[in-house]
Amino acid sequence: MKTNTFRPLVLSAAGLLAVSTAFGNAFTAPDGPVRKEVKEVRPLKAVLKDAKAIDAILQKAYAKHEVTPLPAADDATLVRRAYLAIAGRIPSYEETLAYLENDDSAKLSALVDHLLDSPAHDSATFNWWADLLRLQTRQRGGNQVGAGEAYVHWVKDAVRQNLPFDEVARRLITAEGYPWEDGAVGYYLRDAGMPLDNMSNTTQVFLGTQMVCAQCHNHPFDKWTQMEYYKMAAYTYGVRDRVNNPKQRELQQAFYAKTRGLSREERAKLTRSREFQQLRRATGEMMRPLQYGADRTERKLQLPHDYQYEDAKPKDVIAAAPIFGQAIAPAEGEDAVDAYAQWMTASDNPRFTKVIANRMWKRVFGVGVFEPVDDLRDDTVPSNPELLEHLEALMVRLDYDLKQFARVLYNVKAFSREASAEEITVDKPYHFPGPALARMSAEQLWDSFVTLALPYPDERLLDRARLDYRMEQLAVYEEKMEKLDAKKLTGLAKKGAKASKAIAAKMERIQKQMAEAAENDDREAMARLRREYGQVRNEQRTSFAKLVMGDDFDVRSLYGYGRGNGASAKRDPRWAGFSSQLMRASELPTPAPPGHFLREFGQSDREVIENASREASVPQALTLLNGVIYREVYRQNSPLSENVVRAQTPKDKVRVLFLSILNREPTAEESETCLVELKEALAQVAPQPKVPEHLKGEKRKKYLRYLEKKRQTQQTYGPVAKAYQGIAWALLNTRQFSFVQ
C-alpha cells in the first residue's frame, strides 16, 4: 500500500480542495483495482443537482407539516460534523484551521469529496459494516484457520475498492470455498451450525425484514409464516460450513476397506480398538485445516419434528420459494444460491433498494425516513414517502455506489443546518429540519481521542502480512494434501499417531506436576509448567502438519504464528514509542475485549445485528474522569501536546486546546476563565532572560535555541503543563466534545 505524506488542506481559487497530494492521486486497495477519486467518477455539478432535488422535496414537507428548518450551522460546527460523519473522528488542529481560515463558498462540498476519498472514510465505513455483519476477528466458525480475520479483511478490501452495495451482497451470499480462496465465506462461517439463523440475518440486513420469530412459529406481529421461513431458508440450506473434501471420502473408504469381510463383532472390536481410534484421530488432525469453508451440497431442508400447521406434515422436505415476488428460476449455469442472490439484489426487489437507501439516509441524518430501519412491514409508513421513493430511484441510478449516494446527501442543505435537539419518537414523524443531535458512537469517541494522541492516525494500519502469509501457507498445505493418496496419508497418520501418543504422555506428566505445584502453592513452578504445557500442546498441533509438509515447512504459520507482527506501527518511525494498541477502532480486534474503552462506550459485541449502544452510563463517566487514555493524549510527543508547546502565549495555547478538542475558537469569556485558571501555575515560571548584546551570529542563534528549549521544557513538565492538561481534561469531559452537533 502506498504511504502518503501529510500536507495541510488547501483550497484552490475555484474552491476545490487540492488534496490529491495528501493521499495520492489514487488509492490502490489490496488485490483490487486503482480507485478513482469521487469527482472523477461523477462531476460535482451533477451531485449538486441531485442534492437540490432532495432540498425541494424536504421544502415541500416543511410547508405541508408547518416545520421551520433550522438555521445554517457555523463553519466550526460543520467541519466537526463532516469529519465525525464521514471520517469517523474529529478533525485535527491543522484540519480545523484549514477549513475555518478559508473563505471559499464551495469549501464544504470540497471537504466532503476529500473525506470520501480518504482512508479515514474507509475506517469509519468498515465500522458501519462490522456492526451490520456482526464481524468478529475470532469468530466461532473457522477460527482454527483464521476465517474471522480473513472475513474482516475481505470487508476492508470491499470498502477500499468501493464495491457497489448490491455486488457486496451478491458476493457474500454466493461465497464458497476456503477462507484463503475467498474471505467472504466468513459470511456463512459466522453462523456456523446455524443455517436457519443465517437466512434470517440475511433478510434483516439486506431486506430490512425481521423473520427470526417465524423460525419456530408463525410470526405474531408480522405476516410471515413458519412455512415461508423454511421455504426461504431452503435456498441456502445446502451451503454447509464444513467442506466435504474428496480426500476425506478417500480416507473413509480406506478405513471401511479395513473392515471388509469381517463379522459384525470383529468390525466392532476393530473400530473400538485404541490403535484404530488413534489412527482416525490422526487423519482427522491432518484434515482439520481443510474442514472450514462454505461448501454447496444437495442437502435438503425438512420441517421441524414439531411443525403444527395444516399446510404440511412434520419433517416434510421443503422446496425453496421467495417470501414475495415471483418464483426464482435459475438461469443456465446457475444454481439455487446464485439465483437467490440475484433475486435478493435485483433493483426491482421491493425491499432491497428501499432498505439500503434508508440506512444511508439514517447514517447521514441520524434518523431514517422509516424506523426501525430493519423492521420494514406492509403497514410501515415513511415520514416522507416522496423522499423515500426519490432516494430509491437515486440509489438505482447510481448503481448502488454508496460513496456517490452519500456524496449527494452530504450536499443536501439539511445536512448544513444546526442539529435538532427534538426528541425522536416512533409515533411522531421527523421531517428533517436539520440532522438529529446524537452522542458519538464508541468508535467515533475512541478515534477522536486517538486523533489527539497519535500523529497520522489514519495511516497507522494493521499489518496484514501475517494473515496473508497464513492464507498462502494454508493454500500450499491444501495443494500438498490433494496430491497424497489415501495409502500415503494413512501411512503418515500411523507415524503421527505414535508421535501423538508420546506427546500425550508428556502432557499428562506436566498436568500431574501442575496439580502438585498448585497444591503446594508454588506459583513460580505453576507459571513455568504452564509455559511448558503450552509448548507441548503446540508441538502436538503442529506434529501432524509437519509429517505432511516436511521439516522445512513453517507449520506454525497454519495456526497464526510466524511472519508478520500485526502492526505496521512497530516498524514505522512515525509511531516509535507510541502504544501498539493506539490505533483506530477499525484496526483493533473486533469486537474489542470486555473492559476496553470501546466496549465501555457501547461498541457492539457483534452477536446481534447493529447491537451498538450510545446510551450514557456511570462506567463511561468514570472512564472519562480517570481513564488511562489521558496518558497518551498528554504525552510529550502527542499532536495535542506538541501544538500547545509550539503556541507562544498562554492565550494562544488556550486557543489551540479549544481548536483541537472542540474544533472551535474559545469565546472571550472562556478564554478569560482559562487564563485565570492558569495564572497561579504561570507565576511559578521564571521570566526568560534577555539575550546579552555581546552575543552575535551563531552564538546568538545558539543561545536563542537554548532559551526556546528551556521554555518548551518548562511548559511540557511541571505545574504549567499540568494546568494546561487540566483545561484539556475539562474540555474532553464536556458534552460538546462527546456529542455530534
Feature-to-residue mapping (PLM):
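N-terminal pre-domain segments of enzymes
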Residues: N25-Q59
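Active-site beta-strand/loop architecture of penicillin-binding DD-peptidases
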Residues: I356, G595-P619, V628
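Primarily short, surface-exposed interaction patches in extracytoplasmic proteins
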Residues: L48-R80, I90-A120, R134-N565, A569-R574, ...
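Bacterial N-terminal signal peptides
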Residues: S12-T21
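Bacterial N-terminal signal peptides that target proteins for export
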Residues: K2-A13
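Post-BTB helical module
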Residues: L84-A85
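Globin-like tetrapyrrole-binding proteins
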Residues: I727
